[in-house]
Amino acid sequence: MILYAAGAVLIAAVKWVVRIIGYLPKGVAAVFWLVFILPLPSQAHEFWIEPSSFQPDPGQSLTADLLIGTDFLGASAIYVPDQIETFALLGTGAKSQSERYEITGRYGDRPAGKMAAGSPGLRIIVHQTAPIRLIYSDAKKFDEFAREKGFDDALNQHQGRGLPLDKITERYQRYAKSLIAVGGPEKMGTGQDRHLGLAIEIVAEANPYQWPPLQSMPVRLYADGAPLANAQITVFTRHNPRHVETAKYQTDKDGRSNFALLAGRDYLVDSVILRPMDGAVESGDAMWESIWASLTFQVPSNQKM
């Protein structure tokens, strides 16, 4: 009951932030974002890409929101060039290596990404943030975040390293992907997600847009180029904006996991690595590093005509 109440308060706060930012001039909104929103991510807030359409027509104008939030409800990030290392639309076909469209914008743009959907087939939107530093003045908050993401022993490790509890420093970086299906029924289900070589990455091993709809989704988690075993992934299933289900899974020895799918739903898959940084005290660097992966897609409810 307490957790439910806390979640309700957090969701209400996110909605309040979204409303406030919407009324602000672009320049003021940018400052508001940098001061109040950027510090949120490592406090167990997911980061994901949400396109204006998961199934656009060929060449259709498309936007991509960068969202920070919880339970698949978030505040839309503005375009901040200094906080972006990669933002692109990629192909998945035989010529996928040459099918790359860099997504750029102006400081303060929201949604952060604007693009044309391109030719028919599966497309990948990828976004990589620059590293951001965070300070926890409360060890309890660090412990809550670590436990939520599957690192129950992190605080004990921290104390075992002889590090202070009143100033826990962390450096984090985000790696987000979104799968969209461009085109009509003749192209429904063509193309395949692929490993892009991100520091942490979730790869869909089946096309979620194939028809008839998949009954389950096999995914594989990679870290530093290799499959990551025994890692937690969290799956958010959005039936509608007010109805989101959450489930947690573990990857097997080959970095794979599998979860059930329902037609007509949106999915967010999330995974985090939290690891100590050696020599942090001597170098003045962060004590911990976290890297975050997310993948969004939609399962169609009917074949697009």
Residue ranges and their predicted role:
Residues K26-P39:
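Bacterial N-terminal signal peptides
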Residues L40-A44:
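Sec/Tat signal peptide C-region and signal peptidase I cleavage site
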Residues H45-T63, D153-M217, Y222-P227, H239-R242, ...:
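Beta-strand-rich domain onsets/edges
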Residues D71-I78, R220-L228:
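Structural motif
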Residues V80-D82, A226-T237:
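Short, ordered, surface-exposed loop/turn motifs in non-cytosolic proteins
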Residues T86-K95, Q232-K248:
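Short amphipathic beta-strand segments in non-cytosolic proteins
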Residues D109-G113, A247-R265:
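Glycine-centered loop-to-beta-strand initiation motif
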Residues A130-D138, R275-A280:
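Short acidic/polar inter-strand loop motif in beta-rich domains
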